[in-house]
Curated annotation (Swiss-Prot):
Changing Q1014R: Found in a patient with schizophrenia; uncertain significance. It comes from Homo sapiens. Changing A652P: In MRD6; uncertain significance; changed glutamate-gated calcium ion channel activity; results in decreased agonist potency and mutant channels activated at higher glutamate and glycine concentrations. Component of N-methyl-D-aspartate (NMDA) receptors (NMDARs) that function as heterotetrameric, ligand-gated cation channels with high calcium permeability and voltage-dependent block by Mg(2+). Participates in synaptic plasticity for learning and memory formation by contributing to the long-term depression (LTD) of hippocampus membrane currents. Channel activation requires binding of the neurotransmitter L-glutamate to the GluN2 subunit, glycine or D-serine binding to the GluN1 subunit, plus membrane depolarization to eliminate channel inhibition by Mg(2+). This is Glutamate receptor ionotropic, NMDA 2B.
Length: 1484
């Protein structure tokens, strides 16, 4: 029990814990696994060096530690090697072997391969026979060699031959294993190469025959190539070289190249080996035995470490060379994969599948004259580096005299010697080039290993060398000189090419070598092969382009003649021809041939010809006359020739002129005294050449000055010339001529086209007293005799810039080239600005004095203008000529108008259907005496309208612009009328009539400005003639206040028509008058003198017709009745402009109820028998009734007139069509005479109307004539006119049947020529065309209920009556498919749109449908014309007008004219002013 207790005591457990901890620590501190490697050295290897190599701590970073066993042995027989390795495996448990020997026995490699295949142990042969080439290895072997493969050595041999351009060779081999691989590698390489290889012979020698000497000798005699490749063992090579020497294949001119297998141990050289033998060998100099042992151990250890890291085990050690089991095979195969791919210390130590290194360290060794192997090259990273750029010829001293292979030095200098790189694909030079070597000077170079690179040379001198060598029969090695250039003697020693020849490193020197006396003392020169000397090269400097270069294609005389012919001759000729042409703008210089038509002035003629010269697409006015057109055509031909000639010569003058420094020679002042010029003249040359020597010997001062400008080479000198650092370059003429000919852009030239100073020549330098001189001279002379030298000169020395054959180089034009054009534009803009300022100064400051405002008399400008007009038109201008007299006063002559009417009717018939519509272009109305037009400055044809004009209240700043226009007009009426001068600049927005509400609205101003007016000649009729009663004055005010847009474009079917002209689309602007009018009277007149735009010119014919009418001499002795009281009228208008208290401002009004109210008013009038001549309530003017004008009552401004004067002024004893006095007419304003006063006409008008009874009616509906005296109701302001059924039937019988729309040209003729008579509406010959098969076939037929209209008691139907629902019917408004009125066109702005924009609202009136019954019971006159209420889009400017002269209201002369009476033409035509656009017509 006691012993058991001791075992279980705590002390026992403590001991166990300590043992456990110590055991765990021991396991944790256990060393990493190790691998046994045996290093076997055979021979006298340095064991100490090897021990130091593997004992270094270089493998501590690996997971496996190498355990190296050094073994030394002397026997190299197979049995000894096998026994020793097997003993090491059983005793030392080795897992790898590193084997090295110092023998040349390739059999050792075969033994090691056998052992590795049997024991599955990795073996590395690192030196000696163990590393020699072994062709066929066992598949299971892990034998690796530190040496190149057969294929690698064959590639290195080919690179050596390629380096020295040895392309012709032969192959000699024995039956040693691997010879087939060697030959196959050579053949495959040369077949797939771009180099022109020539494999002459492949000899396979059998060394086993007893009588082989004679056979081998016979085979070797077949060899003729200078390069021979040999593949065999070292022993076999000794015998082969002995036989080759006997047949003369080892002497001078033959080069043998052998692999490392032949060279073997470099310490032992057989005596049979020829001098100059080249071998590819493993590097023994930089990669010695200790380094190889260290790398061998590292390879095996690294592979085991990688295997352990991935698989956690390493191969088990081999205990015996026998009984190999499967597990050992698996482990060895796995280790073999890691041995192939090994990288140690950043170096790739991998092996190929055949057991050779992938990147071996190879060297090229040469057996020199001392019978020692000399390293002359290195193969590294698949590139060859050789020591000698020219291969040395190793031959006996006695044979040196007979050497025909020469070493030649040259110098790069185009075009004589041009150096290029080798072909990147083949690594060789092309056929037309010669290989040449260029040394590389590096800091680390040694005399034994100078670096160089292979280049290819060509050029003029190289071609001469090739021809000479072929003629003289010698070969050569060419290299580039690195010590200097051509050659200069420094401190008694020559450098450059001359120095190479003097030092006998080269036999000849070929290049651009100048012959001189100093060089001829040390070398011999051949005859010159090219003449040269000293020449000077300069650069073409860019000159400046003149700012007037764009004008230089033509001389100043040509430019002056062109402008004179344009401005004076051609333009004036075209204008004169057009002026006098019967088909041109005949004598109407201002407005063209037709009123409102285009004009043709001298300015337009100049503009036309200017546009033709420069082919500018500008809008021009073409002439109409044949003569002027011919003139323009001839000018166009001139313009083509002029512009083509200018364009063809422009480029020559826009380029920069080049400047070249002119130098006469080396004695020129610029060379001898360069500092006398500013800046100093800079010149230089390339030092150490014949040029510098010549200058130094002859021009010492010049040589001293040019030293600081000397250049390192020709290329540097050319660059300095182009960049402006050098002004002249002095050098050999041959070189400079070539450079000038090949210069890009031909900017470099030689003075005097290659002028040469100090002529000499280029020659070939040969060693002194050499036997080659005579042969070379004869060869050069032969080249001259055969003409080959000229061919070479043409090939190499002629450039593209020579002989002035260079092409013109195109270049971009910069700002310098185009500066003159920009200067001209800048000057034009400056001149335009000055003209603009002068124009404004004259217009705002000096114009008024020239116009006569300052002196109160006609100014100079006015006098000149009227004088020109008098000369052109033959009209005498009197200073105080009556405004009633005018050359156009005869236009109202009755007989003349009849003839014009016939001609116009014919023209209208010929122009039917113009623009696709037969509708009339203008509704002609009867002309009657016009009341005073307060907007006379607009020059529209205006007369009384059957509308009241109720003026809206004044609102500040609402219509200030428009009021200011009216103020300017009325402030200068007297002077304006006397001078017949008008202001149309701001007054062409829209047409106006005398009844225009805006004509009065525009006069309202919150500041009550005073106005001065001039009385006007009108018939003696009241101002309110034709105005409706005051009952509807509010409605007319709303019509004038708003414009009505059709709801056709707003979602409704009804259409509200507008009487606005299709051309009058100008937006109306409004303003207000501020300030004291008395201070502005003068300024108002100044504003009225503003220049009119072209759009206002079309109204001039209207004005002249109207003035002719008004200026007609009075028919009565008392002509004062044509003028109203000036002061009274002025006071009346002043009263209109005063601010009214409690007057409402502008506001939006719902017109629906108002429109209905108007319909009701017409209905009541119809029921009560009201007619067109019904006398209604008094008419309101302005904003109150106190200014109303009632029939028979004097106007407010005429309240001071006596009853006799008023009766005389308002009487009806004047013709309705003309202001002729009716002497036999009673002036009693009662009864029927009161109702038909305005319908009375004189005998002449009646006869004219009955002479040609052409039934026409554009929109006039036959209204019943009153048959009984007017019944005066209790209301003094209302008069009723009953209708006669009989008369209605007669009128119905005479109703028009045809209607057409006038073309614009016809309308213009009517304006100018047929102003007094309305033209025939449509040609009768077109009626048949419209009747059948036409969409207008039924437009001439009466509707079913057309008789209803004649039976109506009231001749004025309701405004809301629809045409298609109207029982009365009537004709269709138009047979045209185009919109009849402007409100049907949504693209024409109206007055209402302007109001909407002004107040920020949308269109605010839409027609409400009316009751059919009401329409039938009370037809409206507007409904007979259109199916929409005729609401003017210019209300507020022009009130709505009835068609023709349907007068409504209490008036002294109300009437409804029938269509048989002649009617004077009214230019206002329902408020329209038609204006022809200049862009519509094209005459060419």
């Amino acid at each position: 029990m006691k012993p058991r207790a001791e075992c279980c005591s705590p002390k026992f457990w403590l001991v166990l814990a300590v043992l456990a901890v110590s055991g765990s620590r021991a396991r944790s501190q256990k060393s990493p696994p190790s691998i046994g490697i045996a290093v076997i050295l055979v021979g006298t290897s340095d064991e100490v060096a090897i021990k130091d190599a593997h004992e270094k701590d270089d493998f501590h970073h690996l997971s496996v530690v190498p355990r190296v066993e050094l073994v030394a042995m002397n026997e190299t027989d197979p049995k000894s090697i096998i026994t020793r390795i097997c003993d090491l495996m059983s005793d030392r448990k080795i897992q790898g072997v590193v084997f090295a020997d110092d023998t040349d026995q390739e059999a050792i490699a075969q033994i090691l391969d056998f052992i590795s295949a049997q024991t599955l142990t990795p073996i590395l042969g690192i030196h000696g026979g163990s590393s020699m080439i072994m062709a066929d290895k066992d598949e299971s072997s892990m034998f690796f060699q530190f040496g190149p493969s057969i294929e690698q050595q064959a590639s290195v041999m080919l690179n050596i031959m390629e380096e020295y351009d040895w392309y012709i060779f032969s192959i000699v081999t024995t039956y040693f294993p691997g010879y087939q691989d060697f030959v196959n590698k050579i053949r495959s390489t040369i077949e797939n190469s771009f180099v022109g290889w020539e494999l002459e012979e492949v000899l396979l020698l059998d060394m086993s025959l007893d009588d082989g000497d004679s056979k081998i000798q016979n085979q070797l005699k077949k060899l003729q190539s200078p390069i021979i490749l040999l593949y065999c063992t070292k022993e076999e090579a000794t015998y082969i070289f002995e036989v080759a020497n006997s047949v003369g294949l080892t002497g001078y001119g033959y080069t043998w190249i052998v692999p490392s297998l032949v060279a073997g141990d470099t310490d032992t050289v057989p005596a049979e080996f020829p001098t100059g033998l080249i071998s590819v060998s493993y590097d023994e100099w930089d990669y010695g035995l200790p380094a190889r042992v260290r790398d061998g151990i590292a390879i095996i250890t690294t592979a085991a470490s990688d295997m352990l890291s991935e698989h956690s085990f390493i191969p088990e050690p081999k205990s015996s060379c026998y009984n190999t089991h499967e597990k050992r095979i698996y482990q060895s195969n796995m280790l073999n994969r890691y041995l192939i791919n090994v990288t140690f210390e950043g170096r790739n130590l991998s092996f190929s599948e055949d057991g050779y290194q992938m990147h071996p360290k190879l060297v090229i060794i040469l057996l020199n004259k001392e019978r020692k192997w000399e390293r002359v090259g290195k193969w590294k990273d698949k590139s060859l580096q050789m020591k000698y750029y020219v291969w040395p010829r190793m031959c006996p001293e006695t044979e040196e005299q007979e050497d025909d292979h020469l070493s030649i030095v040259t110098l790069e200098e185009a075009p004589f010697v041009i150096v290029e790189s080798v072909d990147p694909l083949s690594g060789t030079c092309m056929r037309n080039t010669v290989p040449c070597q260029k040394r590389i000077v590096t800091e680390n170079k040694t005399d034994e290993e100078p670096g160089y690179i292979k280049k290819c040379c060509k050029g003029f001198c190289i071609d001469i060398l090739k021809k000479i060598s072929k003629s003289v029969k010698f070969t050569y090695d060419l290299y580039l000189v690195t010590n200097g250039k051509h050659g200069k003697k420094i401190n008694g020693t020559w450098n450059g090419m001359i120095g190479e020849v003097v030092m006998k490193r080269a036999y000849m020197a070929v290049g651009s070598l100048t012959i001189n006396e100093e060089r001829s003392e040390v070398v011999d020169f051949s005859v010159p092969f090219i003449e040269t000397g000293i020449s000077v090269m300069v650069s073409r400097s860019n000159g400046t382009v003149s700012p007037s270069a764009f004008l230089e294609p033509f001389s100043a005389d040509v430019w002056v003649m062109m402008f004179v012919m344009l401005l004076i001759v051609s333009a004036v000729a075209v204008f004169v021809f057009e002026y006098f042409s019967p088909v041109g703008y005949n004598r109407c210089l201002a407005d063209g041939r037709e009123p409102g038509g285009p004009s043709f002035t001298i300015g337009k003629a100049i503009w036309l010809l200017w546009g033709l010269v420069f082919n500018n697409s500008v809008p021009v006015q073409n002439p109409k006359g044949t003569t002027s057109k011919i003139m323009v055509s001839v000018w166009a031909f001139f313009a083509v020739i002029f512009l083509a000639s200018y364009t063809a010569n422009l480029a020559a003058f826009m380029i920069q002129e080049e400047y070249v420094d002119q130098v006469s020679g080396l004695s020129d002042k610029k060379f001898q005294r360069p500092n006398d010029f500013s800046p100093p003249f800079r010149f230089g040359t390339v030092p150490n050449g014949s040029t510098e020597r010549n200058i130094r010997n002859n021009y010492a001062e010049m040589h001293a000055y040019m030293g600081k400008f000397n250049q390192r080479g020709v290329d540097d000198a050319l660059l300095s010339l182009k960049t402006g650092k050098l002004d002249a370059f002095i050098y050999d003429a041959a070189v400079l001529n070539y450079m000038a000919g090949r210069d890009e852009g031909c900017k470099l030239v030689t003075i005097g086209s290659g002028k040469v100073f100090a002529s000499t020549g280029y020659g070939i330098a040969i060693q002194k007293d050499s036997g080659w001189k005579r042969q070379v001279d004869l060869a050069i002379l032969q080249l001259f005799g055969d003409g080959e030298m000229e061919e070479l000169e043409a090939l190499w020395l002629t450039g593209i810039c020579h002989n002035e054959k260079n092409e013109v180089m195109s270049s971009q034009l910069d700002i310098d080239n185009m500066a003159g054009v920009f200067y001209m534009l800048g000057a034009a803009m400056a001149l335009s600005l000055i003209t603009f300022i002068c124009e404004h100064l004259f217009y705002w400051q000096f114009r008024h004095c020239f116009m006569g405002v300052c002196s109160g008399k006609p100014g100079m400008v006015f006098s000149i203008s009227r004088g020109i007009y008098s000369c052109i038109h033959g009209v005498a201008i009197e200073e105080r000529q009556s405004v009633m007299n005018s050359p156009t006063a005869t236009m109202n002559n009755t007989h003349s108008n009849i003839l014009r009417l016939l001609r116009t009717a014919k023209n209208m018939a010929n122009l039917s259907g113009v623009n696709g519509s037969p509708q009339s272009a203008l509704d002609f109305i009867r002309r009657e005496s016009s009341v005073y037009d307060i907007s006379e400055h607009r020059r529209s044809f205006t007369h009384s309208d059957c509308k009241s004009y109720n003026n809206p209240p004044c609102e500040e700043n609402l219509f200030s612009d428009y009021i200011s226009e009216v103020e300017r007009t009325f402030g200068n009426l007297q002077l304006k009328d006397s001078n017949v001068y008008q202001d149309h600049y701001h007054h062409h927005h829209r047409p106006h009539s005398i009844g225009s509400a805006s004509s009065i609205d525009g006069l309202y101003d919150c500041d009550n400005p005073p106005f001065t007016t001039q009385s006007r000649s009108i018939s003696k009729k009241p101002l309110d003639i034709g105005l409706p009663s005051s009952k509807h004055s509010q409605l007319s005010d709303l019509y004038g206040k708003f414009s009505f847009k059709s709801d056709r474009y707003s979602g409704h079917d009804d259409l509200i028509r507008s009487d606005v002209s299709d051309i009058s689309t100008h937006t109306v602007t409004y303003g207000n008058i501020e300030g004291n009018a008395a201070k502005r009277r003068k300024q108002q007149y100044k504003d009225s003198l503003k220049k009119r735009p072209a759009s206002a010119k079309s109204r001039r014919e209207f004005d002249e017709i109207e003035l002719a009418y008004r200026r007609r001499p009075p028919r009565s002795p008392d002509h004062k009745r044509y003028f109203r009281d000036k002061e009274g009228l002025r006071d009346f208008y002043l009263d209109q402009f005063r601010t009214k208290e409690n007057s409402p401002h502008w506001e939006h009004v719902d017109l629906t109820d108002i429109y209905k109210e108007r319909s009701d008013d017409f209905k009541r009038d119809s029921v009560s028998g009201g007619g067109p001549c019904t006398n209604r309530s008094h008419i309101k003017h302005g904003t109150g009734d106190k200014h109303g004008v009632v029939s028979g009552v004097p106007a407010p401004w005429e309240k001071n007139l006596t009853n006799v004067e008023w009766e005389d002024r308002s009487g009806g004893n004047f013709c309705r069509s003309c202001p002729s006095k009716l002497h036999n007419y009673s002036t009693t304003v009662t009864g029927q005479n009161s109702g038909r006063q305005a319908c009375i006409r004189c005998e002449a008008c009646k006869k004219a109307g009955n002479l040609y009874d052409i039934s026409e009616d554009n929109s006039l509906q036959e209204l019943d004539q009153p048959a009984a005296p007017v019944a005066v109701t209790s209301n003094a302001s209302t008069t009723k006119y009953p209708q006669s059924p009989t008369n209605s039937k007669a009128q119905k019988k005479n109703r028009n049947k045809l209607r057409r729309q006038h073309s614009y040209d016809t309308f213009v003729d009517l304006q100018k020529e047929e102003a007094a008579l309305a033209p025939r509406s449509v040609s009768l010959k077109d009626k048949g065309r419209f009747m059948d098969g036409s969409p207008y076939a039924h437009m001439f037929e009466m509707s079913a209920g057309e008789s209803t209209f004649a039976n109506n008691k009231s001749s004025v139907p309701t405004a809301g009556h629809h045409h298609h629902n109207n029982p009365g019917g009537g004709y269709m408004l138009s047979k045209s498919l185009y919109p009849d009125r402007v409100t049907q066109n949504p693209f024409i702005p109206t007055f209402g749109d302007d109001q909407c924009l002004l107040h920020g609202s949308k269109s605010y009136f839409f027609r409400q449908p009316t009751v059919a019954g009401a329409s039938k019971a009370r037809p409206d006159f507007r409904a007979l014309v259109t199916n929409k209420p005729v609401v003017s889009a210019l209300h507020g400017a022009v009130p709505a007008r009835f068609q023709k002269d349907i007068c409504i209201g209490n008036q002294s002369n109300p009437c409804v004219p029938n269509n048989k009476n002649p009617r004077a033409f009214n230019g206002s035509s329902n408020g329209h002013v038609y204006e022809k656009l200049s862009s519509i017509e094209s005459d060419v």
